A protein has these predicted regions:
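Structural detector for helix-capping/boundary residues
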Residues: 66, 83, 113-114, 341
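Glycine-rich loop(s) and the adjacent beta-strand/alpha-helix scaffold that form part
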Residues: 88-202, 267
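Alpha-helix boundary recognition
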Residues: 31, 69-73, 129, 140, ...
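Stable alpha-helical elements in mature extracytoplasmic
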Residues: 22, 26, 63-67, 123, ...
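FAD-dependent oxidoreductase catalytic-site/capping-region signature
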Residues: 1-42, 49-51, 190-343
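A short acidic-Thr-Gly-centered motif at the start of a beta-strand
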Residues: 69-73, 108, 343
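Conserved redox-cofactor binding core of oxidoreductases
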Residues: 1-95, 164-188
């Protein structure tokens, strides 16, 4: 839908260049239970379909590719890597400089106009806390002078929790870890040649090719669940070594009611922050996730996907307690933290 898609911007959005049959199977199975959506970035997100990708000519088009790389040679831009920001220095509550460390050398960078803090949902609140902005009693517990008592800093952490089901399938069409699958190891070099010469083939895949936005309750105005169908087996963010080929499907809670916190562990910026996402602390989140698991498996158990339904972690679909136990044991972040810098 051209009304919802720009045409000339630097960050390119494109259709996938590789047509994986298993992604088609997912969409076909899902469309027997939900409507088909050919453009998730159009006027309506609900339905089952194939995701668009931020690619150009089959290669990743990230924010760095689109915006940073073209600007790197500007005389008024200095990029500092291997740098840790400690805190922002203030004068009468006006940000005037930034204290940081680059390769063990401490620097203070003074602002001529303004300072923009873009450290993300974990970095920004911890920098503010070390700078003296946050909950006064918490700052005092670390012997930090409170410049501004803002109780929302480091609070209200919300994140999308995600559960994955993996299915082992012996197929040439699916991804696997290098040398963990004979089929993929044999096919990968030929696909690499295709990618280098024509920017086509498996290596143009984003892996999470298909998906859906669905409702746990049809009375809802908008979807509260998202599915990602991945043309490879995934466990523990890819850290778990698995032999063979397969596919996975994620179910993600889009509107969690559970909230957590992020706080500094000390005044040392090299110390990892204390992150408590507090997942599933609200009972309604678990209720929706259980419904979401069932809706996901309803698609997995529908042809043409059902013929490949060799689940690595099977659960009794009729047992709420078993589903809840699996969700508590195996769910994890899908990297969408927000909400920790309430001003």
């Amino acid at each position: 839908d051209d009304q919802y898609h720009g045409q000339n911007g630097p960050l390119n959005v494109a259709q996938l260049r590789h047509d994986n049959p298993f992604t088609r199977y997912f969409v076909e199975a899902g469309s027997k239970h939900h409507k088909t959506n050919n453009d998730f970035n159009g006027s309506d997100q609900e339905g089952v379909g194939v995701y668009q990708v931020t690619q150009k000519n089959g290669k990743r088009c990230s924010a760095a590719v689109a915006y940073l790389n073209p600007a790197k040679q500007r005389k008024n831009l200095t990029i500092m890597t291997d740098t840790v920001v400690d805190k922002i220095n203030f004068k009468n509550l006006t940000a005037v400089s930034v204290k940081c460390t680059t390769k063990n050398k401490v620097n203070e960078l003074h602002a001529k106009k303004e300072i923009l803090l873009c450290g993300g949902a974990y970095g920004s609140p911890t920098i503010l806390q070390r700078s003296g902005i946050g909950n006064e009693s918490f700052l005092q517990s670390h012997n930090i002078e409170c410049l501004l008592d803002l109780k929302g800093v480091g609070e209200n952490l919300q994140d999308h929790i995600d559960y994955i089901t993996s299915h082992r399938v012996d197929s040439w069409e699916l991804f696997a870890k290098p040398f963990k699958s004979l089929k993929f190891t044999m096919r990968a070099p030929f696909e690499l040649i295709k990618f280098v010469l024509a920017s086509k083939g498996m290596w143009t895949s984003n892996l999470a090719e298909g998906g859906a936005f669905i409702k746990s309750d049809e009375n809802l105005e908008v979807p509260d669940l998202q599915l990602h169908f991945t043309v490879g087996m995934v466990e523990d963010h890819g850290r778990t070594e698995m032999w063979g080929n397969g596919f996975s499907c994620h179910v993600c809670l889009l509107r969690p009611k559970s909230v957590g916190t992020v706080k500094i562990a000390s005044t040392n910026p090299d110390d990892d922050p204390l992150i408590d996402p507090n997942y599933l602390s609200d009972d309604e989140d678990m209720e929706v996730m259980i419904k979401g698991y069932r809706k996901m498996m309803e698609i997995m158990n529908t042809e043409p996907l059902a013929q490949f339904n060799n689940v690595r972690n099977p659960i009794n679909i009729d047992d709420d307690k078993a589903i809840e136990s699996a969700i508590r044991a195996r769910s994890d972040t899908i990297y969408h933290p927000v909400g920790t810098c309430k001003m």
